[in-house]
């Protein structure tokens, strides 16, 4: 096999490795204060139960705030003190999906929310 073919094969393999891990979040929601909300984050391309999944918030014009993390393998969950009791983080390992949930939204919850591995 020529060096060009080996390089092309190596690049194809590396692109596959880089592209396979994905976290796909549910879409934007419009809700009123007092309503409940559950947003999802579906993982693929890796062992979902072997990595922590974190949630962060970005309020308009502000930086990122760490909310909490979950280890889907055993559902071990840790919250930032600022968010403890305000939200619930959970995971369903059978469908490789993590969740961030509010039982009663406030106007101050208006923000962008992101999951990360």
Swiss-Prot record:
Region Complementarity-determining-1, annotated ranges: 45-52
PROSITE patterns assigned to the protein according to its UniProt record, in alphabetical order: IG_LIKE (PS50835)
Keywords associated with the record: Adaptive immunity, Cell membrane, Disulfide bond, Immunity, Immunoglobulin, Immunoglobulin domain, Membrane, Secreted, Signal
Region feature (Framework-3): 78-115
GO annotations of cellular component type: extracellular region; immunoglobulin complex; plasma membrane
Residue numbers spanned by region Complementarity-determining-2: 70-77
Main subcellular localisation: secreted
Entries under Gene3D superfamilies matching the protein: Immunoglobulins
Region (Framework-1): 20-44
Keyword Metal-binding: no
GO-annotated molecular function: antigen binding
InterPro entries for this protein: Ig-like_dom, Ig-like_dom_sf, Ig-like_fold, Ig_V-set, IgHV
Ranges for domain Ig-like: 20-117
Biological processes, Gene Ontology terms: immunoglobulin mediated immune response
Disulfide bonds: 41-115
Signal peptide: 1-19
CDD domains assigned to the protein according to its UniProt record, in alphabetical order: IgV_H
Region (Complementarity-determining-3): 116-117
Protein function: V region of the variable domain of immunoglobulin heavy chains that participates in the antigen recognition. Immunoglobulins, also known as antibodies, are membrane-bound or secreted glycoproteins produced by B lymphocytes. In the recognition phase of humoral immunity, the membrane-bound immunoglobulins serve as receptors which, upon binding of a specific antigen, trigger the clonal expansion and differentiation of B lymphocytes into immunoglobulins-secreting plasma cells.
Assembly and binders: Immunoglobulins are composed of two identical heavy chains and two identical light chains; disulfide-linked.
This protein's name: Immunoglobulin heavy variable 5-51
Protein's organism: Homo sapiens
Recorded name of the encoding gene: IGHV5-51
